[in-house]
């Protein structure tokens, strides 16, 4: 009887130790999983922080250029950047045209209509650049989206690029963006100046590829 009792006690102890060992192992595995998750979350947090820092630097670069050329402007560099990324349009090209068209909304009729690129309306296939009854946008930022849609749907089509537009700024329907015969030459000059004076491309690449 004593032998049987000892055997039973031994089996119970062994069983308990196995259960305890399994619990310890599960706890260890859980701890390692939590540690790995923590490291992953810290990595994501750091990545997000870097992404924010890169975008802030890009915004600062764009705003600094705009403010230098047109101190009284009211347009948002961040709004321009976001729209350019959305429509995959060269930021420097957009800035160059905004500077040429209206001094970033501070010159000519654009100062009254807030139409930075002198595009008053766009419905997807037609653009009306004639301002009727003095109507315009409530804020310069509102003129960004119509301008982007106009470029993307009428000019930057059939493989045409921003570079092509600086050679001959004509839509697929044969419409010139501006009547000024030296428009492309002036646009390209400003574009090249922006390219030399800023680090927009590098900062944008850092932001998009972090």
Q: Where on the chain are the PLM-derived regions?
A:
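Catalytic cores of secreted/periplasmic lytic hydrolases that degrade extracellular macromolecules
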Residues: 2-93, 99-210
